[in-house]
Design a protein with these regions (language model features):
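N-terminal pro-sequences and low-complexity stem/linker regions of secreted or lumenal proteins
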Residues: 1-173
Length: 173
């Protein structure tokens, strides 16, 4: 148990940064053994999804530390054009795609970097259905980024919103 106002102990750090054993996550473990994956993720900026995603793909969050505050969502569209890993792959002649869920309607990755990725929206941003088809046929690009669905019954591995409140003892939480 963490103590308020006290420096965490080494054991408490281990709990916070702990993970799962391969046996606990057989599907992910199988994927990790067969493909290049990140098994130790350290955020470029300790913040929310958009700044972290931007830092991951473009090595900058443009100084933004929140998804929406201090400029709204428009700040992402108005951000300076900054090359992304996708642009570098394009320059190197390597294939790439961003796969996103149809329910989301647009790729957040594409929106965050619209200034430099808009020319590729029709050619390199595809549905998860297309991902399944590409994978089944053995036609995945050299680099694939699978974007989780972050709205409409999300599958982004964050805990569901309001889960405790919806449970049997929700009134007690």
């Amino acid at each position: 148990e963490l103590k308020e106002g006290a420096q965490p102990t080494e054991e408490e750090y281990r709990v916070i940064m702990g993970g799962f054993t391969p046996e606990m996550l057989p599907v992910f473990s199988t994927i990790a053994r067969g493909f290049a994956v990140f098994d130790r993720w350290f955020a470029g900026v300790p913040s929310q999804t958009f700044p972290n995603r931007s830092f991951f793909h473009a090595s900058t969050s443009h100084g933004f530390v929140t998804n929406k505050n201090l400029g709204g969502y428009d700040k992402w569209i108005d951000a300076p054009a900054t090359p992304t890993v996708f642009n570098r792959l394009e320059e190197a002649g390597l294939s790439w795609r961003v796969y996103y869920d149809e329910q989301q309607m647009v790729s957040f990755t594409g929106v965050l970097h619209a200034a430099v990725l808009q020319p590729y929206w029709k050619s390199n941003f595809r549905s998860m259905e297309q991902f399944h088809d590409d994978a089944a046929k053995g036609h995945l690009p050299a680099y694939s980024f699978i974007e989780p669905r972050m709205i409409f019954n999300h599958n982004d591995m964050h805990p569901p919103w309001g889960t405790l409140r919806e449970g049997e003892s929700g009134g007690d939480t």
